[in-house]
Amino acid sequence: MKIEAIDVTLVDVPASRPIQMSFTTVQKQSYAIVQIRAGGLVGIGEGSSVGGPTWSSECAETIKVIIETYLAPLLIGKDATNLRELQHLMERAVTGNYSAKAAIDVALHDLKARSLNLPLSDLIGGAIQQGIPIAWTLASGDTQRDIAIAEEMIERRRHNRFKIKLGVRSPADDLRHIEKIIERVGDRAAVRVDINQAWDENTASVWIPRLEAAGVELVEQPVARSNFDALRRLSADNGVAILADESLSSLASAFELARHHCVDAFSLKLCNMGGVANTLKVAAIAEASGIASYGGTMLDSSIGTAAALHVYATLPTMPFECELLGPWVLADTLTQTQLEIKDFEIRLPSGPGLGVDIDPDKLRHFTRAG
């Protein structure tokens, strides 16, 4: 089954609500949607970065250029089912650009799984779990509004784990914000925080113990992505788990973080690692090192979320579960059906490949003009 065509479409999907982070406020999310055609089938994937190039060195625009200029010409005509060879060719041809590679890699996995009439999770070994508890991000910036959202999510049995974005306000104001939320919902929900690199080590060393005392169970990326030494000291000095997100940007970074036990958990993201196989390698590094795997998101659409869910469902343990909330923070979905959240878990979709199909009308509607 030879690759006949690789199409890349830029889409911009509005957020259903502003998402306030330490470095930007996300009003919309842009994606490079990939469709690979072979043997009468189409495999789909996507590449993106939260808020554009402010979070990483890639964005939807660079992903499209890298694929169309370098990766697509290299892969067209090759055997679509030889996933290892295709990954090797991409690695040799392009340095970094992991989200571009992941978009291709996921589409190829989807294509092969569809050709075998298998779910993606079966293609890579089989799902251990059919649903994963899913956290919701509270990022309105308003304490009372965040409390109301948390109460609603618990009542509807959608989420009882909440990640709260910090770093825009002062640490003291952030702590008061956290304490008020935990006071209201802490007996019914777990609370973790994401600082998105906003603090230096001294600030983190003062305020992380106070967050732990307030009832926070997990602290994500408190310091700059490159400051592995600070992460190691903070992890050693605090009982609350420290989660690497921005710091986990390659297989090499995973090895270094694990070798020095800099953190307690890895935030897995297919787009950070270059696709399915490398994400599973990072999870294996984590497991061998006593580090927890956490199901991260790049605010993926239902396409990227389905792919990640299939991968995460094959992992034996995920103590802090996942945050695959992307499809529900967007104003609309790009697929014909929405993924399901039931009893606080996101459910693994059935059907071949990713288990979701692009809605052509919605794809056209959100395609960027020009």
From Swiss-Prot:
**Record-listed Mn(2+) binding positions:** D194, E220, D245
> Keyword Isomerase, does the record have it?
yes
InterPro entries for the chain: Chloromuconate_cycloisomerase, Enolase-like_C_sf, Enolase-like_N, Enolase_C-like, Mandel_Rmase/mucon_lact_enz_CS, Mandelate_racemase_C, Mandelate_racemase_N_dom
The residues responsible for catalysis, as annotated, are K165 (proton acceptor), E323 (proton donor)
Question: What is an example of a GO molecular function annotated in this UniProt entry?
Answer: chloromuconate cycloisomerase activity
Name of the top EC class for this enzyme: isomerase
Q: Which SMART domains match?
A: MR_MLE (SM00922)
Pathway as given in its UniProt record:
Aromatic compound metabolism; 3-chlorocatechol degradation
**Where is the signal peptide, in residue numbers?**
none
| CDD domains associated with the record | MLE
Q: What UniProt keywords apply to this chain's record, in alphabetical order? A: Aromatic hydrocarbons catabolism, Isomerase, Manganese, Metal-binding, Plasmid
PROSITE patterns associated with the record: MR_MLE_1 (PS00908), MR_MLE_2 (PS00909)
Q: Name one GO biological process term.
A: amino acid catabolic process
Protein EC: 5.5.1.7
Classification via Pfam families:
MR_MLE_C, MR_MLE_N
Reported cofactor(s): Mn(2+)
According to UniProt, the reaction catalysed is:
2-[(2R)-2-chloro-2,5-dihydro-5-oxofuryl]acetate = 3-chloro-cis,cis-muconate + H(+)
Q: What does this protein do?
A: Highly active toward chlorinated substrates but retains diminished activity toward the non-chlorinated substrates.
Name-wise, this protein is: Chloromuconate cycloisomerase
